[in-house]
Amino acid sequence: MTPTKQHKKETFTHFIFRVFMILVGAASAAVSIELFLIPNDFIDGGIIGVSLILDHLFMSNPFLNFAFFVVILNIPFMIFGYKYIGKTFLVSTFIGIVGLAVIESSLHHVEAITTQPILATVFGGLLLGFGVGLVIRNGGSMDGTEILGILLTKKLPFSVGEFVMFINVFIFIWAVFVFGPEQAMYSFMTYYIAMKTIDAVIQGLDETKAVIIVSEQYDEISDAILHRLGRGTTKLKGKGGYTDEEKDVIYAVVTRLEVTKLKSIVFEVDQNAFITIMNTHETRGGKFKNAIH
């Protein structure tokens, strides 16, 4: 029986750096929400959007505020994320969401930066997108609807993007009745700007990424991806154009929430590995295994 290989775990220094970057992202999102969105009755999509609407509806109760709702509503999704994506994702997401709630609450008595709708839309969207993107780039998430989308679309004939958009349509329709059509339209513009900013921060919003890895340690890397990320790999035969040497090439498909973890795994095994990460237009067929890192 072949003994199970022991793989390196994330170093404490790298973990602290990730936590710092996640908190920077949470702070950016909190500033956007408290100083741009809430004063102008704007919302975002997903759990943040629902939390903003509920914050407005229960404004007479100081305890039922945005911070309360964004934590409570995300708890079920964090549990699902732990089960299907992994412990690292759970810890990163927990830090991001709690950080967002705490920082947003501490800004309650700070005056709004602007009440000009266009300025609030543009800069609120930019700050929110930057913050959420930074959290995702460092292995976490602030939006449970995307986690739910990743899980449900394994069994439903929809992409994650289609599922999230479907949910957000209902959230913005709800906003029309709560805030009025004009604020809902500004909110949609804010959401669009935020999504484009997230795209720029994490280099791609597709739910899955195709990854090609070239390394002399292809067996160990493939084994690490399987046992730490729970993803299968395909070994391809390649030949160097200059050296004419044959090489084994690893091909894998992962969700965008797993890209950070995959890169960490690869470079822990081989710092000289060559990685290419590509957006996939659509992924159909086959079965993703549950992540077990």
Curated annotation (Swiss-Prot):
Q: Where in the cell is it found?
A: Cell membrane
Membrane-topology annotation of the record: Multi-pass membrane protein
**Highest lineage ranks of the organism?**
Bacteria, Bacillati, Bacillota, Bacilli, Bacillales
In the record, the note on similarity to other proteins reads: Belongs to the UPF0750 family.
GO annotations of cellular component type: plasma membrane
Q: Which InterPro entries match?
A: DUF2179 (IPR019264), N-reg_PII/ATP_PRibTrfase_C (IPR015867), UPF0750_membrane (IPR051461), YitT (IPR003740)
Q: Does the keyword Membrane apply?
A: yes
**Pfam family, any one:** YitT_membrane
> Predominant location of this chain?
membrane
Question: Membrane: is it a keyword of this entry?
Answer: yes
Looking at the record's lineage, which domain of life comes first?
Bacteria
Q: What is this protein called?
A: UPF0750 membrane protein YqfU
Going by the UniProt record, its keywords in alphabetical order are: Cell membrane, Membrane, Transmembrane, Transmembrane helix
**Provenance organism:** Bacillus subtilis (strain 168)
> Where do transmembrane segments lie in this chain?
19-39, 40-60, 62-82, 84-104, 116-136, 160-180
Q: Could you tell me which CDD domains the record lists for this protein?
A: YitT_C (cd16380)
